[in-house]
């Protein structure tokens, strides 16, 4: 998502300076939008960038930042103007910049392989050249980037759900109870049938939304919101059902499903909660 917004909205100098190392995975980026007091209401952010002779002096903090304290570059949404969305800009903060610091590594339910921390700015000096696009257009860029991010999260959910389904299906054929494999009990058959159907429907819906976004269709954003909401909800349901099929074994680390359940749960919150997805969808359909 960070690479996309630099590629799409950054000038040539920013692209040449940062993109090569990002796309080669030599450098890691963090997308800094959420703040302690502004999650779903992202436009209420308070991190402020005051104009200086060199560029900007950044003050504030960002919360729940994936890669916080680990990343090489931070894409930061900050307020350079009034209190409306038009007063928000996007800047790039390089790791090691004076005034940049981090909170403790958060202890999370899932996503344990990825560091998450508060990112703090205390008179952090940013060169004017690190402004992405135009001043005051940052919120627009952030929302554009979130469309792609929502598809990414949905795709990750789908992959996790597919794996959980495969584990459960295989287990149901091997595990016997009352003299026969549990896969031959109608209750398990119905669960597996529903899981397979949900996976196929979610996959097709996700591909449709991705195609609309790639082709700049007018309903792309609402289709992305629909896909993110549906796929992440369905994927968590599938993984949770898979755990139930394994019974007590599903609760053990050894079988891998408990990790999928823990990891997929946050996908219903990331990149805009699924409640916010419903708000986006409702506003679109009611405006027709």
Q: Residues of each region from the PLM?
A:
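Short Gly/Pro-enriched turn/cap motifs at secondary-structure boundaries
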Residues: 37-40, 64-67, 79-82, 108-115
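Long, acidic (Asp/Glu-rich), low-complexity accessory segments flanking structured domains
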Residues: 122-140
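Flexible, small-/acidic-enriched active-site or ligand-binding loops
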Residues: 44, 98-127
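A short core secondary-structure module
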Residues: 55, 59-102
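Helix-loop "lid/cap" segments that line or gate small-molecule binding pockets
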Residues: 1-9
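Alpha-helical interface subdomain recognition
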Residues: 9-14, 21-26, 39-42, 51-56, ...
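A short, Trp-centered hydrophobic/proline-enriched beta-strand micro-motif
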Residues: 25-33
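Conserved hydrophobic/aromatic beta-strand scaffold that supports enzyme active sites
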Residues: 30, 46-48, 73-77, 90-92, ...
